């Protein structure tokens, strides 16, 4: 039963988490580069 609801939960989670993860990764990368 829970498997049918999985895509409905994963799509918004991935849509929110992935951009945040990318922004944080880029921010940390830029900060690291600017320190050197």
Swiss-Prot record:
What's the chief localization of this chain? Answer: plastid
Q: Where in the cell is it found?
A: Plastid, Chloroplast thylakoid membrane
A biological process (GO) of this protein is: photosynthesis
Q: Keyword Transmembrane helix, does the record have it?
A: yes
Keywords recorded for this protein, A-Z: Chloroplast, Membrane, Photosynthesis, Photosystem I, Plastid, Thylakoid, Transmembrane, Transmembrane helix
In the UniProt record, does the keyword Transmembrane occur?
A: yes
Q: Which Pfam families match?
A: PSI_8 (PF00796)
| Cellular component GO terms, alphabetical | chloroplast thylakoid membrane; photosystem I
Q: Which InterPro entries match?
A: PSI_PsaI, PSI_PsaI_sf
Ranges annotated as spanning the membrane = 10-30
How does this chain sit within the bilayer? Single-pass membrane protein
Family as reported in the entry's similarity comment: Belongs to the PsaI family.
Q: What does this protein do?
A: May help in the organization of the PsaL subunit.
Q: What is this protein called?
A: Photosystem I reaction center subunit VIII
């Amino acid at each position: 039963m829970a498997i049918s609801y999985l895509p409905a939960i994963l799509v918004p989670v991935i849509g929110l988490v992935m951009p945040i993860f990318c922004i944080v990764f880029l921010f940390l990368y830029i900060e690291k580069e600017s320190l050197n």
